[in-house]
């Protein structure tokens, strides 16, 4: 989910 979810910014 790269850039799919807003929380993804934390997963980089």
Swiss-Prot record:
It is found in: Secreted. The keyword Secreted applies. Coiled coil: none annotated. Keywords: Hemostasis impairing toxin, Platelet aggregation activating toxin, Secreted, Toxin. GO terms for cellular component: extracellular region. Residues 11-12 form the C-type lectin domain. Expressed by the venom gland. The keyword Ribosomal protein does not apply. GO terms for molecular function: toxin activity. Belongs to the snaclec family. Dimer. Snaclec that binds to von Willebrand factor (VWF) and induces its interaction with GPIbalpha (GP1BA), resulting in platelet aggregation. In contrary to bitiscetin, it does not bind to the A1 domain. Instead, it interacts with the collagen-binding A3 domain of vWF. Also interferes with the binding of vWF to collagen. This is Snaclec bitiscetin-2.
